[in-house]
């Protein structure tokens, strides 16, 4: 019987596993992976990136990634998509990723539309957002939480989150220092807020899938 592994798909070298890092998680780069070799029996984390899910001419590997996501999600594989990963899941399953009217950046509370044990630890807390793109939900998806835009949805055995549960203080500082225009938007105690998020991110990652 094949051993189930967790494989992280990295779409951007600056966006890593962060708080979800684990020696048992195998990492693969989206632009260099043989999609046909990836077993549907494994579990996958699809990480974020600076590009849009629709930028397939500039990043042609995204088209192959979306085709693969459609196949494995429809076959019941467990996938956890983060930010760009959520947009790719939405786009691959019948939704549409697109450039939104505004940038969502900083720490914001979510509005929950459904009670779920998996996400209960995120209620009344702030999650870290950093994106300009958003998406429409696939027809078979279930919206769990949102801001003005969708933030958490489930589809078959997969979970997609638009925010960054993987963010650590180091990752935050790397992203923050690379874009001075964002600095005036953040006035929170970064360290204490991120510690709370990291705890809940790890709980989210180790929770059963929505259909278990």
Residue ranges and their predicted role:
Residues 193-204:
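An accessory alpha-helical subdomain
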Residues 72-96:
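Catalytic nucleophile loop
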Residues 25-80:
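Flexible gly/pro-rich beta->alpha loop and the following alpha-helix that scaffold active-site loops
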Residues 9-11, 30, 84:
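Cofactor-binding loop segments of dinucleotide-utilizing enzymes, especially the Rossmann-like FAD-
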Residues 91-172:
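Pocket-forming structural segment of enzyme catalytic cores
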Residues 205-212:
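Conserved small/polar residues in nucleotide/adenosyl-binding loops
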Residues 156, 162, 167-193:
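C-terminal helical/coil "lid" or tail adjacent to the Rossmann-like core of SAM-dependent
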Residues 5-24:
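Short, charged N-terminal beta->alpha structural module
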């Amino acid at each position: 019987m094949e051993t189930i592994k967790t494989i992280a798909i990295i779409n951007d070298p600056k966006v890593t596993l962060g708080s979800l890092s684990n020696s048992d998680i195998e990492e693969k780069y989206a632009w260099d992976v043989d999609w046909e070799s990836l077993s549907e029996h494994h579990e996958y984390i699809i990480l974020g990136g600076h590009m849009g899910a629709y930028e397939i001419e500039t990043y042609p590997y995204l088209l192959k990634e979306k085709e693969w996501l459609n196949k494995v999600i429809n076959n019941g594989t467990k996938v956890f998509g983060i930010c760009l990963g959520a947009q790719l899941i939405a786009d691959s399953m019948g939704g549409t990723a697109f450039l939104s009217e505004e940038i969502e950046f900083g720490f914001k509370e979510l509005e929950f539309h459904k009670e779920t044990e998996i996400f209960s630890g995120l209620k009344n807390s702030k999650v870290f957002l950093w994106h300009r793109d958003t998406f429409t939900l696939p027809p078979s998806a279930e919206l769990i939480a949102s801001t003005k835009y969708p933030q958490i949805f489930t589809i078959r055995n997969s979970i997609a989150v638009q925010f960054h549960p993987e963010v650590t203080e180091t990752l935050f500082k790397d992203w923050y220092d690379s874009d001075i225009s964002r600095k005036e938007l953040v006035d929170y105690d970064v360290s204490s807020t991120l510690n709370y998020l990291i705890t809940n991110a790890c709980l989210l990652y180790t929770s059963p899938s929505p259909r278990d």
